[in-house]
Amino acid sequence: DTASEIGTNIIVVVNDNEMSIAENHGGLYKNLKLLRESNGQAELNFFKAMGFDYMYVEEGNDVSKLVEAFKKVKDIDHPIVVHIHSEKGHGYKPAVDNKENWHWSMPFNIEDGSLKNLSGGENISLMLGDWLLDEMKRDEKLVAIAAGVPRCYGYDKEKREQAGKQFIDVGIAEEEAVALASGMAKRGAHPVFSDFATFFQRTYDQLCQDLAVNGNPAVFNVLGASIYGMNDFTHICFFDIPMISHIPNLHYLAPTSYEELIAMEKWAINQDKYSIAIRVPEGPVVHSCEEYDTDYSDLNKFKMAHRGEKIAIIAVGNFFYKGEAVRLALANDGIDATLINPRYLSGVDEVMLERSEEHTSELQSRL
C-alpha cells in the first residue's frame, strides 16, 4: 500500500482469472468475487481501502477492451488499480476444461491436449501423497499443507476432498505455510508441508525464526531438489542444500530410495523433538529391499553401505546409486572402495570419517 501514497501515476494491473493454481483460498478472493459480481461497483473495495483509484474491466480476454482501458489510465495523475476479469486457459478447450492441470504442461499434442513422450514410470511425489493420504486414516493429527500447488502431492480435487480438514492449501504463500506448520506442531499436530525446492527460498525467514528457533517438530518435504528437477532461470531447484542444511536446529535428511523415504517420513512425523526437512529423491523412482532404520534421532550418523579400502565414496540421496556404480566399476579394476550413505545433510559423522581415513588414502564426495 506504499504505492498509494507516492502520488504518481503508478498503474497496478490485477489479472483476475478466478484461479490460483488450484482453487483460491483466503478473504481477499471473496472481495474479488464481490467486485466481479457487481461489475466493480461494490462499496466494499479492498483496493480503494488501500488508497488506490479503481477501474474494472469485465471482458479481460478482449484485446480491444484492454487497449481502451489502458488508454484511459496511461496518463492518469494518481495511483490506480485496473482489475481485469479474464479466463484461465482462454482459447484452448482442454485448458479451459481443466484449468488446474493446465497451469503448466509438458510438450503436448495441440489437437487434443494429450501429452507427448509419456514415460509411464512411477512418480515419487504422487506416491508420497498417496502414502500420506493413507496415514491420515490412522493419524487424525496428520495434516498435509500445500502452498498453491496441491498437485505436488498428486492431490486433485477428489483427493483433497478425501483428506478433508487434514489438508490445507494456504495459496501461493509459502511463508504462511511454514509459520502455520510450526504453530500446529507446537500444539501437538503432525503437519507436513511439501513444496518444490525452488519455492523454499521464500520461506527462509520463517524456517529460521518461526520454526528452528523454537525447535517445533514440523516436517518439510523438499521436492524436485536436484539437477534433475526444475532448473530454468526462475525455478532453480539445486540450491536447497546450502540454504537449508546450515540452519541451526533444522535437520535435513536425504533418503536414497522410496522405502528409505517412507522410513524417514514415519519417524519424522511421529517424533516430537526436531524440526525435520526431507530431500525427496528426484528422477526415476528407486526401490530397495534393504531394511532401513526406524529411528533417526541419532543425528548425523552416517551409514556405511560397504567397507573397503583406499577410497571412500560418500554418495548423497539419489546420487547414492551413482556412487554404487562407481564402487562396482572400481571393483572391476581391483579396487575395493568404501561406500557411505550419509543420510543427513545438516551434519557430519566425524567418527565414521575418522575411521574411514584409517582405511583409505582418498576421500571422494558425490552430491
Protein language model features and the residues they cover:
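Generic long, charged, amphipathic alpha-helical segments
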Residues: 160, 166-170, 305, 317, ...
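Long hydrophobic segments that form regular secondary structure
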Residues: 56, 62-77, 273, 307-341
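Aromatic-enriched
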Residues: 284-303
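Thiamine diphosphate
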Residues: 52-69, 75-276, 284
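Single conserved hydrophobic/aromatic residue that forms the stacking wall/gate
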Residues: 358-367
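Mobile "lid/hinge" segments at catalytic clefts and subdomain interfaces of large enzymes
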Residues: 4-31, 35-37, 44-46, 214, ...
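Acidic, Ser/Thr-rich peripheral helices and adjacent loops at domain boundaries
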Residues: 27-41, 101-107, 241-242
